[in-house]
């Protein structure tokens, strides 16, 4: 329930220099966010696809091998989705998203005041 660190770290912008600094941080972390986000989305999308495939599989599948193969892939992705490294990436991704929108908001507020 505590405030995220960036709220205190990025208060209302007072000067053009500050605006420049905020903008630099934004651009720097936006590229990290984009990379992470693409990676995280790919895993989640793949997982959803597999979920759909699994649910469409006939339970008394003619080909047991096919069934087992898809089950195995599904398990792999379940592991990957609950993998601490992946969860960390997902958390970092959400954190960056919120941080970036906070910084962007500060920049927009400053621009409004200045114009």
Q: What kind of feature is each model-predicted range?
A:
Residues 42-45, 57:
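Eukaryotic short linear interaction motifs
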Residues 14, 27-29, 41, 65, ...:
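Residue-identity detector for glutamine
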Residues 4, 8, 50-115:
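Acidic, serine/threonine/proline-rich low-complexity intrinsically disordered regions
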Residues 2-31:
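Short, charge-rich amphipathic alpha-helices with coiled-coil/heptad character
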